[in-house]
Amino acid sequence: MLYLSQTPSLSSIATIPRLNNRTFRPRTIATLQTIIIAARLGKQNLLSLSPIVTSSRLYAFSSPVLPMSLSLSSLPDGKEGIDRQIKQQKKNLRRMLRLRLGNIPQDDIQRQSRLVWDNLFALPQYHDARSVGLFLSMPRGEIITDQALARVLGDGKTLYVPRVGLDFEKCEMDLIKVEDRRSPNDAQDPKPFYHDWPRNKWSIPEPPSDVSRCVAQRGDIDLLVVPGLAFDAAGGRLGQGKGYYDRFISKMREDDGGSGSPLLVAVGLEQSFFEGDTPQIPMSDKDLPMDIVVLPNRSLHVESSR
């Protein structure tokens, strides 16, 4: 039996269609505590957690929890079984986190984004970087990068932005050097440099093939800003599930002799961070930990690998 430190409020749970034979239509979604428990149990909705005991301080669930960290002997088919379990846990987490992040009001995301960029631009690693890789943000549910893109260019740094292209099945991306140094705040041309770029299947602008042929090679990017659905204090990251960043980073580091370049700086919303001193996000040996995690209220430097 698993006990939480405090009772999840019904108003915070979006995926419970029924509880104690009553119907609820809550306004927001589950706390991260509840989400991670459901993911560990392999549940698609929180009804299957079967609440059985409540008190003013404790909330109990009857299902056993599969630990995030598994030994090779804990599953009959060894590492393959562990990899399958991790994959399923991540799938469950993504499903529920997309609901959680998609319900954050846009004005709150804008507020948090400003704080995140203030923290990132204060990092000595940013000041020392000659080149920065930075994503263009999705319409909802993640840190907004519009002003950050302008700031990087305004600081005289070389900027690289992602391009996935049309072959989505390959799940590969390049980072393309931005030649245009216009700022969205330029009085003569208020439009951002990417205003006429085509949008991909996620409604994210990306460089067309004729904008620039300068594709980032090993050693070109000093600092890479990485998005994600969730992060933890051990540098764990949960991405969208396609592996674009993991493949790109692995290629850059492999080509660079495994030197650790570029520096990986994750940026996340308050609602995307899993508290705790130990790893909270399930990761396989193919998943790469972040070096720094930047949040609205702090920056976490990951001291050791997972």
Regions found by a protein language model. Name each.
Residues 30-37:
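Low-complexity, intrinsically disordered tandem-repeat tracts enriched in small/polar residues
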Residues 176-179, 238-245, 284:
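Short, surface-exposed, charged loop/turn segments at secondary-structure junctions
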Residues 2-6, 18, 37-220:
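N-terminal active-site beta-alpha-beta segment that forms phosphate/nucleotide-binding
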Residues 94, 113, 201, 242-249, ...:
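Hydrophobic, well-ordered secondary-structure segments
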Residues 97, 134, 159, 225, ...:
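A residue-level signal for conserved active-site and pocket-lining positions in enzyme catalytic cores
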Residues 2-13, 28, 40-87, 99, ...:
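Surface-exposed, charge/polar-rich loops and edge strands
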Residues 143-150, 235-250:
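Short Gly/Thr/Asp-enriched flexible loops that form oxyanion-binding sites at enzyme active sites
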